[in-house]
Amino acid sequence: MNNLTLSLRRERRLLVLLALVCLALLAGALYLQYVKNEDPCPLCIIQRYFFVLIAVFAFIGAGMASGAGVAVTEALIVLSAAAGVGTAARHLYVQLNPGFSCGFDALQPVVDSLPPARWLPGVFKVAGLCETVYPPIFGILLPGWALIAFVLIAVPVAVSLLRHRGRLR
């Protein structure tokens, strides 16, 4: 086996691991929703969508036969994670500055009208407000944990993509 084959095999294994981590994060969110009764807000649901996208792209990338296909899916993962960073940062800002609450979240009808909210309402249906602050986990609010997760996904995948850009063709 040459170095390119070994590198591609390692990338695929890491993509499967990344997808499983994203699914575990979604399972954790569902645990908080159904066991701890922490209703998801529109920004929570949008973050769930980004974790699902990352998992889907990672599984697709793991099944790619070519380095170029892996690189494309890794680029999509980085874009999804970057969008997740923005969403989680906004959510954290809203929770840390709740002064402008009106009791209605304008994003709710938009998020609830997306097809997955009809297909899997228990996972993707809005039930809470973005400014509702639930107890922190190890001193960090839930949007803070999502922000950390998205950064920990985006940075290594982007570095891997840049490092292997010539070898994964």
UniProtKB/Swiss-Prot annotation:
Assigned keywords, A-Z: Cell inner membrane, Cell membrane, Chaperone, Disulfide bond, Electron transport, Membrane, Oxidoreductase, Redox-active center, Transmembrane, Transmembrane helix, Transport
Keyword Transmembrane helix applies: yes
Gene Ontology annotations of biological process type: protein folding
Coiled-coil parts of chain: none
Signal peptide: none
PANTHER family registered for this protein in UniProt: DISULFIDE BOND FORMATION PROTEIN B
UniProt cross-references to HAMAP family, sorted A to Z: DsbB
Protein's recorded name: Disulfide bond formation protein B
Organism: Burkholderia pseudomallei (strain K96243)
Gene encoding the protein: dsbB
